Amino acid sequence: IAEGMLSLGLGLDDMERQERIGQLLERVQLSRDLGQRYPHEFSGGQLQRVAIARALAVEPELIICDEPTSALDVSIRAEVLQLLQQLQREFGVSYLFITHDLSIIPSLAHHVGVMQRGKIVEQGSAQQILTAPRHPYTQALLASVPRIDRA
């Protein structure tokens, strides 16, 4: 978590930096004492929360989230998405999500761009993309999302 603070020279001494790390861990719903652990000692959900704390450490305006929930089980995924929403309200940070998991769109996205082979093929409000997709690729992506009512 301290790496970004150190590389950007945020001007914190060791004690201030450790306090900031503790605060960030608590903000992402982890215990302060986890700051002394090695990465292999964390679960997938804990690792994702540490990654969020690392991003917040440098007080960004924008956080790029590349497949933030792809390796998480459904219950942990929901917790992480809820945490991201809380942090967005609290810190005023914006997110750019890169994901194949279209099921996260309703909970987080305001504006959506759909890319196919590196080019944006459709963009619009999250509601428009989800309810009235125009491009065949967007339609295919949405059709691939598992839904209970299709059974």
Residue ranges, per PLM feature:
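Conserved catalytic motifs of ABC-family nucleotide-binding domains
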Residues: 59
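A short, surface-exposed alpha-helical micro-motif characterized by mixed small hydrophobic
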Residues: 105-107
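Short, glycine/charged-rich "phosphate-handling" switch motifs in NTP-dependent
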Residues: 111, 123
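Conserved ABC ATPase "signature" region
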Residues: 6-9, 15-33, 142-143
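Conserved ABC ATPase signature
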Residues: 38-42, 46
